[in-house]
Amino acid sequence: KSADGKITLNVINYHVGTDYAADYYEYLFDAFKKTEEGKNVEFKFEEIPTTDAYNQKIKLLISSGDLPDIVLNGGNNITALAAKSGKVTDITEYLDKDPEWKAMFSDQDLEFNSYEGKVYGIPVSKEISYIYYNKDLFKKAGLEAPDVAYETWDDFYKACDTLKSKNITPVSMDTADLGWLSNLWYSGLIGTAGEEGNKFMNTMYPTDYTSDLVVNATEQLQKMLKNYTTADALGGKYDTMATHFFNGEVAMLPNGPWMIPDFKSTDKAPEGFYDKVGIMLLPGSGMESVPTPGDMVGAKDPEKIKAAVAFLKFETTAENQLKALEMAGLQPVSSNNEVPESLKESDPLMAEVLDIQSKAKYTYGQNQAYWYQNVIDTFSTQLPELAYGNMTAKEFCQKLTDAAKKN
């Protein structure tokens, strides 16, 4: 504390400039100072304008140096690394003392942010994805989209065949840069394949991809790459594929809520595109849902630790979770949020995203969150070979397994 009783918290902030959440974090730091717990708190900021530079800096400070009092998450899962260094606070007792706060998070969220049974990170959002579809293209093909999802993958393929018969490319897929879109289709194919498939897609670092179930999903992914996507998907990157969707050249694309602001942006999509977009879950009512790395406390002084924990608590109030959704497209970490009337008017698509989550029968992870890096790389580099028919689904799965076993 300084002489005037103020507590100064050091923060390295990458939510600055044109960052998607810059306005939200500016609001959050200001609003906290107006609360009972934050009225004596001042923030001292060091600004780093990119996530990559920020993540490198934090990793450096974990190995040698002092961490900021509040360690914002940069999307990288560094919980174990930080916990092992002894430089971050164990938040478990604070959560246990406040059951209402603890109830905001699922066991999965807290487990993801724990090391050796102790919680070190407080997640502020979760990553989810589903399917966006173009209402105009569905109408043109004489198709009525399901309210929630196609009941089966076969129903989904029938719709793809109908779209194709009207010269409409059914889905966006990619293979370069880790093949994000193809990974979301693949994760859905496995994650909705009954209890066994769902368990597999919720497992961290699997090492065996040779089960009939995964081979079958791979055969279906191969079919989609061969029959239902754009010619440039092989070797193609996400940005190009997203542009196809914006331009009305593709009927469906899997992705998360962070894409919604792009539908309104005339830099990316044509005027009025937002109104043409609908949402559905993956066939079988599947939805990717992955816990995110949380914010941590790097403060040493007991007064500062107390103030930093109070900030994390403020950051995750129901009100601020919805504010983060409205201002930054961050998906609330709690799944029982009321959909505010104001959101239904200002951003009906985002309101629909909040609403449809409770209708998922299967939730599962995706490979970039749960698989070894070299397996993700192998997935991306071997996809074109699979698509061209240069290898069978079985051989593809063996390559993933060989890569995983090297870890």
Outline where the language-model segments fall.
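Short helix-initiation/N-cap motifs at beta->coil->alpha
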Residues: 47-57, 74-76, 150-157, 232-246
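Long, aromatic- and glycine/proline-rich binding clefts that accommodate carbohydrate-like moieties
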Residues: 108, 275-280, 325-378, 384-385
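Short amphipathic alpha-helical coupling segments at ligand-binding clamshell hinges
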Residues: 24, 216-220, 303-315, 323, ...
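Extracytoplasmic/periplasmic solute-binding protein
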Residues: 115-124, 129, 139, 154-206, ...
